[in-house]
């Protein structure tokens, strides 16, 4: 079996949706410009040698439809030779693509693949524009298959005894860690600056355009405090505990990695960043989908021949504080190594992009902490009752 390495990894900043800094930017544009930036960092790579562009997206319709990955390949590489395929496993789509790319290279089916994810929740809302439910399923007692994510977060909070106070504390800490990371410029090296053109009608009724560059995550709020979080009303259930403040933010963003065979890495004289050791997905009850990592993490560890204590750093997607805390407690995760720079409650959760985004963040933080030869993990819950986990060995 061949060895597959990740040689480059970049992401955009994450903007709030639907009225944030990227509301005037299409998803395919965000993705294409990220890939262009990455290609500029690889001048020795002939674009025609790239075998595929694999893009994760959770809501592939509207401006994200029509096999967006192929359009991203055409736009980002500016040649027709490289195909593209869009992949959807909801919130784990972005790391699912890295798993597919790695497996294809290991099997000898490819030598070089761009993998990642992109999502604009400003362009395509959660559940898409016109979901069509299977009412036979609903009428047969499976309405939880279609539960909104907030309802599942309430179910997790109730079943696993996660208090409102603990959820708000977790959310507060997420913002504090993210703000500290921003103040220390810990994200700067991983973020691709994106130019946005905003067209509007000025005071004289004339069409005008202004431009700005986005290179900083929009989500972390300096004014966040425990008192304000405690005053927020539950959003999903009367008397519930899940609020807008202890839930992830709707977001826009893109993130990509370049995966190469060992032979190509040596030929191009590149230094690999990391390798995907194992990726696993698992199923759980849809009504408590947030607990998905509790099944996915042990599965990934077992397949990799590793133990939980072998993991030095973890990026756990904070879909909700309730499910994040439930996962941490059920598995006994060391909170000192989980989301050291904050998570999705502060930094945002651009659905199909998130798995790739968290991978980029993981590599950069492991580099800063000089964790060569150690293992890191990216994990998340997934809608309709799934969990996913990817284990990486950091190299350089």
Regions inferred by a protein language model and the residue ranges of each:
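Condensing-enzyme catalytic core mediating Claisen C-C bond formation in acyl metabolism
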Residues: 1-27, 225-291, 295, 302, ...
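N-terminal extracellular/periplasmic Venus flytrap/periplasmic-binding protein-like
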Residues: 11-12, 24, 28-33, 44, ...
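Conserved beta-ketoacyl condensing-enzyme motif
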Residues: 23-113, 118-135, 191-214, 287-288, ...
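Conserved catalytic cysteine-centered active-site region
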Residues: 25, 57-111, 132, 144-151, ...
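Short, well-ordered amphipathic alpha-helical segments that serve as non-catalytic structural scaffolds
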Residues: 27-43, 68-72, 97, 149-156, ...
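Active-site-proximal alpha-helical scaffold in enzymes
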Residues: 88-118, 157-186, 256-263, 328, ...
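Active-site pocket-lining segment
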Residues: 152, 187-190, 277-346
């Amino acid at each position: 079996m061949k060895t597959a390495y990740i040689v480059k990894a970049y992401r955009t900043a994450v903007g709030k949706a639907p009225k944030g800094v990227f509301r005037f930017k299409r998803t395919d544009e965000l993705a294409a410009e990220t890939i262009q930036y990455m290609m500029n960092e690889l001048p020795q790579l002939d674009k025609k040698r790239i075998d595929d562009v694999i893009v994760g997206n959770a809501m592939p319709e509207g401006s994200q439809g029509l096999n967006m990955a192929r359009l991203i390949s055409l736009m980002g590489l500016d040649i027709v030779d490289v195909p593209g395929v869009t992949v959807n496993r909801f919130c784990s789509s972005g790391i699912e693509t890295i798993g597919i790319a790695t497996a294809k290279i290991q099997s000898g089916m490819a030598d070089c693949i761009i993998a990642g994810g992109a999502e604009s929740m400003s362009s395509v809302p959660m559940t898409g524009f016109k979901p069509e439910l299977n009412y036979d399923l609903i009428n047969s007692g499976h309405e939880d298959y279609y539960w909104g994510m907030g309802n599942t977060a309430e179910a997790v909070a109730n079943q696993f005894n996660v208090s409102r106070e603990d959820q708000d504390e977790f959310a507060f800490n997420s913002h504090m860690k993210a703000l500290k990371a921003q103040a220390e410029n810990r994200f700067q090296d991983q973020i691709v600056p994106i130019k946005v053109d905003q067209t509007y009608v000025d005071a004289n009724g004339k069409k005008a355009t202004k431009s700005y560059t986005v290179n900083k995550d929009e989500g972390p709020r300096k004014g966040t405090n425990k008192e304000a979080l405690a005053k927020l009303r539950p959003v999903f259930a009367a008397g519930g505990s899940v609020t807008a403040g202890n839930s992830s933010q709707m977001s826009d963003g893109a993130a990509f990695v370049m995966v190469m065979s060992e032979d190509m890495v040596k030929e191009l004289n590149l230094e690999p960043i990391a390798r995907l050791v194992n990726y696993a997905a698992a199923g759980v009850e849809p009504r408590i989908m947030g607990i998905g990592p509790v099944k996915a993490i042990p599965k990934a560890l077992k397949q990799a021949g590793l133990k939980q204590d072998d993991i030095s750093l973890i990026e756990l997607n904070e879909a909700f504080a309730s499910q994040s805390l439930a996962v941490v407690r059920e598995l006994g995760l060391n909170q000192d190594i989980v989301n050291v720079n904050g998570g999705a409650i502060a930094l945002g959760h651009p659905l199909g992009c998130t798995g790739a985004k968290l991978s980029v963040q993981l590599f950069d933080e492991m580099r800063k902490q000089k964790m060569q030869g150690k293992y890191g993990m990216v994990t998340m819950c997934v809608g309709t009752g799934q969990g996913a986990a990817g284990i990486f060995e950091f190299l350089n």
